[in-house]
Amino acid sequence: KRRPAIAFVHLLLPPGGEPHASPAGWIGSLDRARDTLESLRIPTIVSSASPGNAEDLNELSEMDPEVLITTSPLLYAAACDVAKRSPNTVFFACTDETVHDNMSGFQARTYEAHYLAGLIAGALSEDGVIGYLANDPYQSKASRLRNANAFTLGAQKSKAAIRVLYAPGNDPDEELKTLIAAGADIVDLERALPSLVERLREHSVRYVGT
């Protein structure tokens, strides 16, 4: 039996799905890449795994793919565990954390979009105070800080005296209230959830985000 060349492992989505897993989004882009590989007669397989569950990945690694790609930062821990036990497979993990001998990392350049968001927020802010809510659970801590720093640099490029308030996203609803109470007139939302957007509208606070 021919050894699979490349295995793609997506995050197992909760019931009802995940709006960011749209055909035009991150997973859709990876699926198009897989389609291209198939068109070149490079055999691939695709699967999904639960966060932190190494057994899901271990079952796939037992098929002995040449390359195994995990497409979510939430699969990083499981990928690390399985990579140590699968020396004949090359792993690519969606992470900016520590990698290993047979594991490399890749990450989207989300900070570029947040820099542009900062340029806009800094230019449009009337009160000189804006906020950043790091509420995307799919981002690592390092990615969140990098995105927030890029947002701040963009805002300062537009308005040198701008104040940027940072909220780590541990309790998005309460932290958003705090940002509003502190005078932020524009907030960058890593995830523009309907409940957060509605609260901003109630207080006539603008936002940027996805």
List each language-model region with its residue ranges.
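An alpha-beta-alpha
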Residues: 117-162
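Second-shell loop/turn segments in exported
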Residues: 17-24, 65-66, 102-108, 134-142, ...
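Short beta-strand elements in bilobed, periplasmic/extracellular small-molecule ligand-binding domains
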Residues: 38-49, 157-170
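Flexible loop/hinge segments that line or gate small-molecule binding clefts
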Residues: 84-107
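Short acidic, glycine/proline-enriched helix-loop-strand junctions
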Residues: 85-89, 146, 150-153, 163-165, ...
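Extracytoplasmic "Venus flytrap"
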Residues: 2-37, 46-51, 140-144
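Periplasmic-binding protein-like
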Residues: 65-73, 92-94, 182-193, 206-210
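Short, well-structured alpha-helical segments in soluble
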Residues: 52-64, 171-183
